[in-house]
Amino acid sequence: MKTLKVLKIFIIVYISSVSLESFAGFGESCSNLPITSDGYLETYTAYGYIIRSIDMKDPRGNCNPSTSSITFCFKNVEGSASPCTIYTLNEGDTRKISDLSTDNNPDLGANTVLKNIVLTVKKFGNDLCLAMPTSRGPMPVACKSLSVTPTATKPKDENCNIGKSCYTGANYSQSLINFSGLAVQCLSETLNKIFFTGSSCSAQDQNSRITHLASFATFQGYLKRIIGAALILYTMFFAFNMALNKEYATTEKITLFIIKFLFVVYFSIGLGPLDFSGGQPVKENGMLKYGLPLLTGAAPDFAGMIFNAAGSRGLCQFDNTKYKDGYKFYGLWDAIDCRIGYYLGLDLLYNIDKNGILGRPVSNGTSGNNKPIPNFDPDGKKDRPHDLSKAGALRFFTVMFGFFMSGHVIILVAGMVFSVIFLSILLYFITHYLVCMVTIYVMTYISPIFIPMVLFTRTKAYFDGWLKVCISCALQPAVVAGFIALLITMYDSAIFKNCEFLRYDYEKGDIRFSTFELRLPSIDADKCQESFGYKMLKYYAGEGWEEHLLILFPIKSIVRDVVSILAELLCVLIFSVIFYYFSKSIGRFAADLTNGPNMDAVTASPTKIVDLVKKGAAFLKDASVHEHGKSSLGDKPDIGNKRKDGAQQGEDAVNSSGGEVADLASGSGGGK
């Protein structure tokens, strides 16, 4: 009997394990899924979690390659009667996670992050897959092979005129907040694609009768043929003059002609074929190979050298050796974007990896105090506003609102003026750089017209003007960067004084970024603790906030260190006002210094935002005065009648006095 009982228990356990195994094979697909080289998506993102919630080899499933639908079993909440629910979708069907997980599964359908993810059935080569959007594009979470191999079709590039860095350029930056470097790289690749390499757009849409115009690169090719023909004629005329006039047959003139002619041909229409690309002969153009990279690279190099020499010790100073080849110019723009984030209290830039989820950081920087200051996750600070703990929040404005709620309007106004002027000047620098870069690309595009003009005495002035514009546009950003570097130095000195910053370098796959933490210096630490930036970081951490009732509603405000904060902020404001007025003439100064065109007419004015704020304030003031005048008139409805009566009485008095004067005149006349 005992043997039979043991045998029954063994059979029951075996059957249960087999059934559980048949239903619990989550993460299994009919065909193999593509795996990323670094395994990042499968391990650290929602993509891998969704894969481990789907089973395609369930006994109720269907991996038949002849069917045009996909069947999968989606995981249910733990403890349900069935481990998963079967779904069958056709190609092109879409479902949200919340539609597939209808049992309020807190890990799937009821999860605020996952419930809105849309899964789509689409083809990936010879596989029919259930795909979801990821940071690396749509990726399949479950697939099955099809019996018929689809015909290979060339993928259509929907954004054929836009550079790829417009979507992937952020991966080359080391700053968590990056937009200016992305804008520069995006514009550079787009201009290069439009002007020189040509777009991948088809000449004619299949669904329309509209034929696109020839690209800029095609037009320049025709232009180079015309210039080449003109240069041939120039050579023929020089040969005729040399044959007819012995003065042209000297060795000096012939040598000078050959050297000048070769340089003109090489930099205008190119010499070739000197290179082979993909087995095809390609002309080598000196302007595209040397001129354009030199002009576009000189601006960020000069500006970066000046800009990196400024600022607080360690703040926003990235490791240039970690930038990929061809993307080292990101260092300049990362420094700008990083400072915008730190000045405005962006939460992502400080103490981001306190839980160690991003990997092991590499510390670089000062050798001062090794303790993070201040502590950004303190216990017992219940009075801090909820907005301070939101990821990506600009906590500077939250703190300014805290001062406003405590009645310190002057601090709020000073803080707003500082932020507006600071952002306006940096926006001016970015737009000035972009305009200069566009000008360089345009000058390079029309270079086949102007470079041959150096051969003729009458047209050499046009070449000199063209060359002057190119050199000026390469140097003007460096001049403006010197002004910005001075501004950054003054701001860092006024805001952080002698504080030091420790850099943390993080690396996950191809993505690299750095954060900076404030450290007290080994000497004069009290000076750093009294700085405006240090106290603002304490407010960001939740220190110094108090909660009190305003009428019936609880509000949170700041009442500590108000006098010192006001004094420090007014010092920053003084520098802001000085640079505000100086920024009005920086564009003209850069143009005069480089003997080039003034770009202020086509750039964002450094005072534009402040001027708009002034106009808005004046408009509100005029509207208030006008409304007040209307209310005053409404209180005195008989003013108009009284004015009319008074005017009538005045006219009668004038007429009466006029009559008396006339009578006196006639009387005096009669006396005579």
Swiss-Prot record:
Q: Which GO terms describe its biological process?
A: protein secretion by the type IV secretion system
Q: Which Pfam families match?
A: TrbL
* Record key words, sorted: Cell membrane, Membrane, Signal, Transmembrane, Transmembrane helix
Q: Where is this region: Disordered?
A: 363-384, 628-672
Query: Residue spans with biased composition (Basic and acidic residues)?
Result: 628-646
| Polar residues composition-biased segments | 363-372
Quote the subcellular location field of this record. Cell membrane
Q: What is this protein called?
A: Uncharacterized protein RP105
Q: What span is annotated as the signal peptide, if there is one?
A: 1-24
Organism from which the protein derives? Rickettsia prowazekii (strain Madrid E)
> What membrane topology does the annotation report for this chain?
Multi-pass membrane protein
Q: Which family does it belong to?
A: Belongs to the TrbL/VirB6 family.
Q: Which domain of life is it from?
A: Bacteria
Asked if the record carries the keyword Phosphoprotein, the reply is: no
Q: Say where the protein is mainly found.
A: membrane
